Design a protein with these regions (language model features):
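A short, basic N-terminal segment
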Residues: 6, 18, 23-87
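Mid-core helix/loop region of P-loop NTP-binding domains shared across ATPases and GTPases
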Residues: 32-48, 88, 123-125, 133-253, ...
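Walker A/P-loop nucleotide-binding motif
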Residues: 87-107
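Post-Walker A helix-loop "phosphate-sensing" segment adjacent to the P-loop in P-loop NTPases
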Residues: 111-121, 152
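Conserved C-terminal helix/linker of AAA+ ATPases
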Residues: 300-321
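Short alpha-helical segments that sit at the start of domains
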Residues: 322-352
Length: 430
């Protein structure tokens, strides 16, 4: 432990030896302005192509949502009965990543509906849970929901059913409509099964004051197909698909945001079009398009140039892919890295389906080389499912007639690169 006196003693020495430092009451050192390092001085003097960069960041809420009028209307239609204290139908929303699902749901429900309810004096509670980030177990989900309705829970000693009951009894304490938005619901279901959905729908029938509606959002298009039939019929009372954006639609989205994000004339002609075309080429992902534009701007600033050029979009694409894959690969546990390395060595590039059995055999050989105990085929199969969810591979189940079913996998292009190989070899010491 460092005592406060020591800190002040050391601060004194530091200030005497380095007079460019001063000390605030809080004890935090700050540099006196005139002694800023050259680098930062120059950085501050340099201009930037951005006027307001955060407009391009993923969590920024835009003030307009082009090309989603149909979906916005459909969500409004489904949730409107809540304003008359009638339970809205459960809604299941699906579409690929970056197609505006989260944005539209938050816009209509947390924004428009909540304001309309306030105005009308109707009690509507809305709870939003991102199952991937905040609750990837059943226990985690009910704890999160209970916390959001203001129920204090002891830190230990409660079972999942206890937490579930505690949440519902608190939620049922006022006459209201409760809308639970379960974003990235497929993550929770893949980890915890669909029992939580069954619990919610069954509990709903027992409540006296509150009526619950669920809005599930998923980018796994086949997600609803895997549900228990009872849960499936209840969750899919209404379904809504968000199609991918095309290049022209992405241009509109980007232009809308670019006008407040960038300084006048700091985007050369063709930049927005190229970002839109690149993002449309993959799967019409608005997040990707916005990232490309933002990173192209950041790279321009780093170079000290005054306008973003078309070529900067290529550099941005390279940087984003490199950063994403590098993070994915290097943060995987060692066993998963070995599985990926085996896939890489069998695949010889992307675009070819390979059998999971072959992967397992090679993986076992690498384990022996690395003096690691191999996981069971079952566990390796779980790792492959995880890779599938992360977009590192694409998996498909094929029937082999009377020999049962087997799974084939294909490495995604962004994982079939020399960079990934090098990162894995470095991480695994191979
Ligand atoms: N029509 C639009 N207008 C303006 N911005 C949009 C539009 N559609 C999407 N975006 C922006 O693109 C990004 C991704 O959108 P969003 O998070 O809603 O996608 P999603 O479908 O929920 O993706 P995921 O399945 O990966 O969660 C966000 O920054 C969002 O603001
Ligand atoms: Mg989302």
């Amino acid at each position: 432990m460092v005592c406060l006196e020591c800190i002040f003693y050391l601060s004194g020495i530091l200030i005497k030896r380095f007079p460019c430092f001063s000390i605030r009451n809080s004890g935090v050192f700050i540099l006196k302005e005139k002694n800023l390092p050259q680098f930062f001085e120059e950085y501050l003097k340099k201009g930037s192509v951005f006027k307001e960069k955060r407009v391009l960041q993923a969590n920024h809420f835009p003030n307009d949502i082009p090309h989603r009028a149909v979906q916005i209307h459909q969500v409004r239609v489904v949730v409107a009965p809540a304003l008359r204290l009638e339970r809205p139908s459960n809604l299941f929303i699906y579409g690929k990543t970056g197609t505006g699902k989260t944005l539209v749901v938050k816009w209509v429900i947390n924004g428009e509906l909540v304001s309309a309810a306030k105005k009308a004096g109707v009690s509507i509670q809305t709870l939003y849970v991102n199952c991937k980030l905040d609750a990837d177990t059943e226990y985690g989900l009910f704890t999160e929901l209970a916390t959001q309705v203001g129920k204090e829970l002891p830190l230990t000693g409660l079972s999942t059913d206890d937490v579930c009951s505690a949440f519902f009894s608190k939620a049922d304490s006022t006459k209201s409509i409760l809308i639970i938005i379960l974003d990235e619901i497929d993550y929770l279901m893949k980890k915890a099964g669909d029992d939580f959905l069954y619990k919610i729908t069954r509990k709903n029938e027992e409540l006296k004051n509150t009526q619950v509606a669920i809005i599930g959002i998923s980018n796994d298009l086949m997600f609803a197909e895997h549900l228990d039939p009872r849960v499936k019929s209840s969750l899919s009372e209404e379904k809504l698909l968000f199609p991918p954006y095309n290049a022209i639609e992405l241009q509109d989205i980007l232009n809308n945001r670019a006008s407040s994000a960038f300084k006048h004339s700091s985007l050369e002609p063709g930049v927005v079009e190229k970002c839109a075309a690149y993002a449309a080429r993959e799967h019409g992902d608005a997040r990707r398009a916005l990232d490309l534009l933002r990173v192209a701007g950041e790279l321009t600033d780093r170079k000290g140039a005054t306008s973003v050029a078309v070529a900067d979009v290529d550099s941005a694409e390279e940087k984003i892919d490199h950063d994403t894959v590098a993070e994915l690969v290097t943060t995987q546990p060692r066993q998963a890295q070995l599985v990926l390395y085996s896939i890489l060595n069998i695949s010889h590039g992307a675009g070819k389906f390979i059998f999971t059995g072959e992967v397992y055999e090679l993986y076992k050989k690498y384990c022996a080389k690395a003096s690691l105990r191999p996981l069971t085929q079952r566990r390796v199969s779980d790792i492959l499912s995880e890779f599938d969810m992360l977009g590192i591979i694409t998996a498909r189940v094929i029937s082999k007639g009377r020999y049962g079913r087997t799974r084939e996998i294909m490495l995604a292009p962004q994982a079939a690169t020399p960079v990934v190989r090098r990162l894995l070899e470095e991480a695994l010491n191979l």
